[in-house]
């Protein structure tokens, strides 16, 4: 193992830069040549590859986004596209690749490994939807971003005595809604993992109004869908002014939290160590505050780890 490369793929997440920094500096410390691949798999098959040095990753640990950029790549989904990427890696003398991203990015790494490329995956996604790891890079920061928005919405909701429905990211995983809901003291958390009844929700809102509540904050994971319809239903049923706020890509930005910076640093170091050990088709993660690594096929096939106990806590504390 003489030369490794690092790329970021899929949706960006705060802390990706910290992971890049850890990979680059660990690789250099171990005597490796480290290359950066720009714009994910798209950059790979287009040869957008450059050598990285210690100064290449100076002053980036605090920055959101990814200095390597990221992109989707339809061509890489084809066998011809992947073979083109492998040939480019060979042309640059690259022996192993560290892929930072979510499940789609890991599937790409999995396909590369089947073509003989040593690959290690680092989980970078605000959705926290990879079951093999307790936390993904970017999730903690995104939770705090949502929390900040909730705090502000609480102020104006109280002033106008209205219901605020806040739609957050999370197509198949409700962790972001759940954690932000508990942290923000939301009256209701609606996630794809749990069924909910609109009529019961409206009844609870009216009961709160009778007790003198000035506002209601409802956190809705985007995977549930129907935010506008729910907003209309609540207002028509309760007679209380109801507003929908969709936070969107705001949740992906911002300076990463201390937790995400440290997590990214730990996982970046581990990824390089695994390559030096000759390992491939592995992903790194965190379980019980211990850095772990798993086979990429097993990691992708693990079922969702939704925390039912935490969801029950959210319901107990909500009203």
Curated annotation (Swiss-Prot):
Amino acids binding ATP: 11, 72-73, 102-105
Subunit structure, as described in the record: Homotetramer.
Organism: Clostridium novyi (strain NT)
Residues the record lists as binding substrate: 125-127, 162, 169-171, 222, 243, 249-252
GO terms, molecular function: 6-phosphofructokinase activity; AMP binding; ATP binding; fructose-6-phosphate binding; identical protein binding; metal ion binding; monosaccharide binding
Entry protein name: ATP-dependent 6-phosphofructokinase
The family this protein is said to belong to: Belongs to the phosphofructokinase type A (PFKA) family. ATP-dependent PFK group I subfamily. Prokaryotic clade 'B1' sub-subfamily.
Annotated positions binding Mg(2+): 103
Keywords, alphabetical: Allosteric enzyme, ATP-binding, Cytoplasm, Glycolysis, Kinase, Magnesium, Metal-binding, Nucleotide-binding, Transferase
GO biological process: canonical glycolysis; fructose 1,6-bisphosphate metabolic process; fructose 6-phosphate metabolic process
SUPFAM superfamilies hit by this protein: Phosphofructokinase
Root EC class: transferase
EC number(s) recorded for this UniProt protein: 2.7.1.11
Residues annotated for ADP binding in this entry: 21-25, 154, 185-187, 211, 213-215
């Amino acid at each position: 193992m003489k030369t490794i490369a690092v790329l970021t793929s899929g949706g960006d997440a705060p802390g990706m830069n910290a992971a890049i920094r850890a990979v680059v500096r660990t690789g250099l410390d171990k005597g490796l040549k480290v290359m950066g691949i720009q714009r994910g798999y798209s950059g790979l098959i287009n040869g957008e590859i450059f050598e990285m040095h210690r100064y290449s990753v100076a002053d980036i640990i605090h920055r959101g986004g990814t200095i390597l950029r990221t992109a989707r790549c339809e061509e890489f989904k084809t066998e011809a596209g992947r073979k083109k990427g492998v040939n480019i890696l060979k042309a640059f003398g690259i022996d192993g690749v560290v892929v930072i991203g979510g499940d789609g990015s890991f599937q790409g790494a999995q396909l590369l490994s089947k073509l003989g490329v040593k690959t290690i995956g680092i989980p970078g996604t605000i959705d926290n939807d990879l079951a093999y790891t307790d936390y993904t890079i970017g999730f903690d920061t995104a939770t705090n971003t949502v929390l900040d928005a909730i705090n502000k919405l609480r102020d104006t909701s109280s002033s106008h005595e209205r219901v605020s429905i806040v739609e957050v990211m999370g197509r198949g995983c409700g962790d972001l809604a759940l954690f932000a809901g508990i942290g923000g003291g939301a009256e209701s958390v609606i996630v794809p993992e749990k069924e909910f009844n609109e009529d019961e929700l409206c009844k609870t809102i009216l009961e709160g109004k009778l007790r003198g509540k000035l506002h209601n904050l409802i956190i809705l994971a985007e995977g549930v869908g129907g935010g506008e319809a729910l907003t209309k239903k609540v207002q028509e049923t309760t007679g209380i002014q109801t507003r929908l706020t969709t936070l969107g890509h705001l949740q992906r930005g911002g300076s990463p939290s201390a937790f995400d910076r440290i997590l990214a640093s730990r996982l970046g170091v581990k990824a390089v160590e695994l390559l030096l050990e000759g390992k491939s088709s592995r992903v790194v993660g965190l379980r019980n505050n211990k850095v772990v690594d798993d086979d990429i096929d097993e990691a992708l096939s693990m079922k969702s780890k939704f925390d039912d106990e935490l969801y029950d806590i959210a319901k107990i504390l909500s009203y």
